[in-house]
């Protein structure tokens, strides 16, 4: 891939309370990892781990909050400002220096990389030092907030004990970003250039870019309303990342689970899927589709 990234690895979702978010996502049938703190950035997270389609990459949702607003890194405070919802696409880099160099061809980027170290205990009790080289959010003209990271090990994101979800979730298949009609073409062009591939048009005001196994779908606000009429009018601050598509092993099972847990949802026949609106999922529209 042109920018030195291997995959759209995970989505960072801002939540006001990790405890409340865990309760919400558990009602939707997701297993959630224990709370973890990244002290150097002043943030806390819990993960929803899923199954990547190839070795060497991860596939998950990161629920992130700010435990103490007085001690959060200013950059992260900005990313996690405003309301709940998807705040950033995080790419897995095969060469983080190449990713930075690609961005620097078009933007000035001073001191772009955080070097983070933390301890992690494997399921068999072994202690490992995890080193993350993480870029700050890409500056300038990126239509949606993006960054990249390069961990020295990836096993912490592939723990089977947290990947057997009651809703049968298998894979983050797509993320949908919404732009105004005027922003749409430049947004598509930005990611075509970043990934070095052409977008596929999937309808009026809908473009899909699939650098590997996860699709970035860019749509206009009008097209977003057409894709998800079930959730009704949604106030969106454009541009924004608004929806995630999750592949599941049993759509009927998801419907039964959501009904049993009193999670408001709409089942549709064509294309087959179940939609949960942002009021039920920390500001994110969830679309469950057959794997």
Where are these regions (language model features)?
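Glyoxalase I/VOC metalloenzyme domain signal
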Residues: 1-8, 13-32, 43, 50-116, ...
């Amino acid at each position: 891939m042109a920018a030195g990234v291997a995959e759209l690895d995970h989505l960072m979702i801002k939540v006001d309370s990790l405890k409340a978010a865990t309760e919400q996502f558990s009602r939707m049938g997701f297993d959630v990892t224990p709370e973890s703190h990244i002290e150097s950035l002043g943030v806390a997270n819990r993960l929803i781990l899923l199954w990547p389609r190839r070795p060497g990459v991860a596939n998950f949702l990161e629920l992130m909050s700010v435990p103490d607003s007085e001690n959060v890194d200013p950059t992260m405070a900005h990313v996690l400002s405003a309301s709940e919802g998807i705040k950033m696409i995080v790419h897995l880099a095969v060469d983080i220096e190449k990713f930075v160099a690609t961005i620097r061809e078009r933007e000035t980027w001073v001191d772009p990389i955080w070097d983070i170290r933390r301890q992690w205990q494997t399921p068999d009790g072994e202690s490992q030092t995890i080193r993350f080289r993480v870029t700050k959010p890409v500056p300038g003209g990126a239509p949606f907030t993006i960054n990249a990271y390069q961990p020295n090990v990836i096993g912490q994101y592939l723990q089977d004990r947290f990947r057997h979800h009651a809703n049968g979730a298998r894979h983050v298949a797509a993320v949908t970003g919404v732009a105004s009609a005027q922003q749409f073409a430049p947004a598509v062009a930005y990611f075509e250039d970043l990934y070095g591939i052409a977008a596929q048009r999937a309808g009026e005001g809908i473009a899909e870019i699939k650098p590997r196994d996860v699709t970035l779908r860019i749509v206009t606000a009008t097209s977003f309303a057409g894709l998800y009429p079930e959730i009704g009018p949604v106030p969106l601050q454009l541009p924004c990342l608004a929806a995630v598509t999750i592949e599941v092993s049993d759509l009927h099972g998801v419907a039964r689970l959501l009904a049993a847990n009193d999670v408001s949802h709409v089942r549709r026949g064509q294309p087959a899927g179940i939609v949960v609106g942002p009021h039920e999922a920390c500001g994110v529209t969830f679309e469950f589709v057959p794997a």
